[in-house]
């Protein structure tokens, strides 16, 4: 979620982009399995991104009309750019158009004012009505006969892995998608130079020489942390009609035992990858396989990355109960509660070396006032505070929450606590930092027997996701 203030500076009016990551069938269509194409369409259109206009009127934030407000879903026309655009791995015999985005998790914001939404667990929306090609790539990305039991493949052939006319439809998902919040007619663009994997988020910063840098986590146990560096100054590239997100290099991280690290080049110019892949389009479509071949460090579920004002990069590693052998960067085996790692790149984010350290272990907070588990969302403010959101089973009798850490002292304080079985996710602020937007996702996991939130208790209504507006009573900076 990101707030785009009107004229780049308004504290009371702007566009809010919000991801709709997933909705279970029982929650959205009222039954465990779809029984028709209409059921599938309803489920599909509950996924995607909303772009809404907000205004603070008399102290109350509310939606207002705007020609740029829109809903982007699984059947919205999209386009591809970068090295994979026009590649054979995106072609289907059905010659169907490029459509949709799904399982949109976290996000990023470009310096030119566009929204980057990240496709995460896209594999779960595919299934098979018959035999299908169980390729190495499909196995690595987690495709299966039933997926996550959405059942779309039963009524929509695009998501049927056994339908040969749509053999490459699965390759059309797993990308970072760029959306212009101030142009309702813009076609969302899948930026393929950033790789294809289970994108959690896209932390954007500007490095040496004005080059654009994007840090990204692949949200699965034993997967990797990536960064993308544009080939030139981002302003210069845009002035020449080039997208900084289309031209540059992708890297994957290797964390060494001595507290140093290396960014390994994920390009076809790398001899290791030239021996395994036909071209750069294939390297990027199968980014996970490329990173495997390079010997990147398997991490404990890399989720949000964020760049602090001092240049340090933080990344949440949510948990990994399946880890049996610890290493320096993932030193708890099993890692049931997660940790946060930080690093500092050389050459102002554009180099290939870095130094790293563990910022904190969630397990170490248990039994204290600072207790939390399963760190997920991250946002650093300019004053050295790190806002941390959680998405798993909390210890010490708590629900999911948002805590604030002092990055200098390590002190933690709780700012927000959610309802049962929800996830605290998304964070956006107005330019003056006196208004903070956050979300609760899938309260009660969509089960009205657990909670009716935000409806009054006992009303019988299905629980709904909610965006909260947080301000201080004294009008000060939130979190201070």
What are these regions (language model features)?
Residues 1-480:
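Conserved small-residue
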């Amino acid at each position: 979620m990101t707030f785009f203030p009107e004229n780049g500076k308004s504290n009371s009016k702007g566009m809010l982009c919000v991801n709709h990551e997933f909705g279970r069938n029982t929650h959205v269509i009222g039954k465990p399995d779809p029984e028709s194409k209409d059921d599938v369409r309803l489920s599909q259109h509950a996924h995607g991104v909303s772009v809404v206009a907000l205004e603070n009127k008399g102290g109350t934030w509310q939606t207002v009309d705007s020609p740029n407000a829109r809903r982007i879903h699984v059947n919205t026309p999209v386009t591809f750019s970068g090295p994979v655009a026009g590649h054979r791995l995106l072609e289907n015999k059905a010659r169907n158009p490029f459509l949709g985005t799904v399982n949109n998790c976290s996000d990023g914001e470009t310096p030119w004012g566009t929204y980057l939404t990240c496709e995460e667990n896209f594999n779960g929306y595919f299934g098979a009505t018959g035999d299908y090609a169980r390729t190495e790539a499909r196995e690595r990305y987690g495709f299966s006969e039933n997926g996550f039991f959405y059942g779309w493949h039963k009524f929509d052939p695009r998501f049927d892995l056994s339908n040969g006319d749509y053999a490459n439809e699965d390759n059309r998902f797993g990308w970072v998608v760029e959306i212009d919040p101030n142009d309702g007619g813009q076609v969302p663009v899948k930026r393929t130079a950033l790789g294809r994997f289970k994108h959690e988020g896209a932390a954007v910063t500007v490095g040496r020489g004005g080059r654009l840098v994007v840090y990204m986590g692949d949200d699965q146990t034993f997967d990797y942390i990536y960064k993308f560096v544009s080939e030139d100054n981002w302003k210069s590239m845009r002035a020449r009609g080039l997208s900084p997100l289309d031209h540059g290099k992708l890297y994957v991280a290797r964390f060494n035992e001595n507290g140093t690290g290396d960014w390994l080049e994920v390009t076809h110019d790398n001899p290791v990858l030239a021996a395994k892949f036909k071209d750069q389009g294939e390297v990027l479509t199968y980014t996970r396989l490329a990173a495997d071949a390079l010997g990147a460090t398997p991490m404990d579920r890399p989720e949000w990355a964020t760049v602090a004002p001092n240049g340090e990069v933080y990344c949440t590693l949510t948990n990994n109960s399946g880890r049996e052998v610890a290493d320096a960067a993932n030193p708890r085996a099993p890692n049931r509660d997660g940790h946060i790692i930080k690093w500092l790149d050389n050459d102002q984010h554009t180099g290939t070396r870095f130094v790293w350290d563990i910022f904190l272990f969630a397990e170490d907070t248990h039994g204290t006032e600072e207790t939390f588990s399963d760190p997920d969302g991250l946002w650093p403010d300019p004053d050295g505070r790190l806002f941390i959101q959680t998405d798993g089973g909390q210890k010490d009798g708590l629900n999911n929450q948002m805590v604030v850490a002092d990055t200098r002292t390590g002190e933690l304080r709780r700012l927000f606590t959610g309802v049962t079985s929800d996830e605290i996710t998304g964070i956006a602020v107005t330019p003056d930092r006196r208004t903070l937007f956050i979300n609760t996702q899938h309260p009660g996991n969509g089960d009205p027997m657990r909670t009716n939130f935000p409806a009054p208790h006992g009303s019988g209504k299905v629980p709904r996701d909610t965006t909260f507006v947080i301000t201080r009573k004294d009008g000060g900076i939130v979190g201070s």
